[in-house]
Amino acid sequence: GVPSVSTVNVAQKQHDVNFLLFKVYI
């Protein structure tokens, strides 16, 4: 099915957090 907008927003925020953590670790 198609994910709801809220689900997409949460996933995007989690991705942003993971990206920031990745930059910190490098």
From Swiss-Prot:
Keyword annotations from UniProtKB, A to Z: Copper, Oxygen transport, Secreted, Transport
UniProt subcellular location: Secreted, Extracellular space
Protein name according to UniProt: Hemocyanin subunit 3
Principal subcellular localisation of the protein: secreted
GO cellular component: extracellular region
Family under the similarity heading: Belongs to the tyrosinase family. Hemocyanin subfamily.
Signal sequence coordinates: none
Task of the protein: Hemocyanins are copper-containing oxygen carriers occurring freely dissolved in the hemolymph of many mollusks and arthropods.
Tissue spec. comment: Hemolymph.
GO MF term set: oxygen carrier activity
